[in-house]
Amino acid sequence: MKICCLSDLHGTLLPVEDYFEPCELVCICGDISPLNIQGNHRKMRHWLINTFKPWCESLPCDKVIFIAGNHDSCMHNEDFMYAQFPKDSKVTYLFHESYIYTSRSGKEYSIFGTPYCKLFGNWAFMEMDEILEKLYSTIPENLDILLSHDQPFGYGDIILEDIYWNTGEHIGNKPLAKAILEKQPKYLFCGHLHSTDHSCIEIGNTKRYNVSIKSEKYEPVYDPLVIKI
């Protein structure tokens, strides 16, 4: 099955004809909100319904699944999100939960999406390590696809750009790394740390991909990942 994955749109909805080839499934790993309105929930709801949703519906695929990121505080309103992006529609929102996608061939793929990130600053969906461990303990074992906004600690989580706050150290999520080693999903697609390693990195039996499309300066520099699973 061919899928397309991307993350960290920050309001940039890439031209469909230029960036997307036909596939079955598109996965978006959070930080969808435009930076200039991310804190205005009324404007964000309007943008999600009138701009983001039609864009997703225009993508050349059968299904779009997306999760929130730390810049998507409006997505804490689960009632609104589930009403606009239900599981039985083309465009589905997952909030730390599972979904079974049935492919054109009839094969079922188990998917779990989680928005949570390690704590820093006053952003959405961020928790202390003790809480993250409890949250990640609910991730099922042997998933086909895990969608996470945050990246696991120790696996390609060093910023590669030469920017003033780059320490050259691993800055990923330790409870997430532990959960992945225990749960062993086949694929992990993530973002959040824009310019870390975008190649396939193996975590045990898990193939991890950073699918962010932005640089640390919020410029669109990476193409969406297209992969057959």
Task: Please report, for each region that a protein language model flagged, where it lies by residue.
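Active-site neighborhood of phospho(di)ester-bond hydrolases with catalytic His/Asp-centered motifs
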Residues: 5-7, 26-31, 63-70, 94-96, ...
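A short secondary-structure junction signal
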Residues: 121-126, 150, 155-162, 200, ...
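Active-site-proximal segments of metal-dependent phosphoesterases and phosphodiesterases across multiple
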Residues: 33, 37-49, 142-184
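Binuclear metal-dependent phosphoesterase catalytic core
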Residues: 98-105, 175-183, 187, 194-229
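Core catalytic region of metal-dependent phosphoesterases/phosphodiesterases
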Residues: 6, 11-103
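Short, conserved loop/helix-junction motifs that constitute active-site signature segments
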Residues: 19-21, 55-61, 84-88, 139-140, ...
